[in-house]
From Swiss-Prot:
GO terms for biological process: blood vessel diameter maintenance; negative regulation of blood pressure; negative regulation of glomerular filtration; negative regulation of heart rate; negative regulation of insulin secretion; negative regulation of urine volume; positive regulation of angiogenesis; positive regulation of blood pressure. This is Urotensin-2. GO terms for cellular component: extracellular space. It comes from the Eukaryota. Residues 1-20 form the signal peptide. InterPro entries: Urotensin_II.
């Protein structure tokens, strides 16, 4: 009998902080950013996307055996950090994508004149 009031007091003591929190109806209000911040976020996302694409093109151009100076027509593009980066124009996006996918493939080592090979396992 002694434990029932103690459990009730403990329960009320633990429940009190939860009841003191304000309850807001989130269904009525939505978070609305000011127009200026929204435009700034869009511009930043566009700059990041452009910088990533240009970096990808640079990487694919140098992997193809070209040095960055020989790559052909280039333009100055801004990066999200505000610096200017040379980017190569005129490359086909399918070429860039195929080079990227080819780079991620696993390169299998060619064994020399292995005398005993069964399927893909060589001794």
């Amino acid at each position: 009998m002694d434990r029932v009031p103690f459990c009730c007091l403990l329960f009320i003591g633990l429940l009190n902080p939860l009841l003191s929190l304000p309850v807001t109806d989130t269904g009525e209000r939505t978070l609305q950013l000011p127009v200026l911040e929204e435009d700034a976020l869009r511009a930043l996302e566009e700059l990041e996307r452009m910088a990533l694409l240009q970096t990808l093109r640079q990487t694919m151009g140098t992997e193809a055996g070209e040095s960055p100076g020989e790559a052909g027509p280039s333009t100055e593009t801004p990066t999200p950090r505000g610096s200017m980066r040379k980017a190569f124009a005129g490359q086909n996006s399918n070429t860039v994508l195929s080079r990227l996918l080819a780079r991620t493939r696993k390169q299998h080592k060619q064994h020399g004149a292995a005398p005993e090979c069964f399927w893909k396992y060589c001794i």
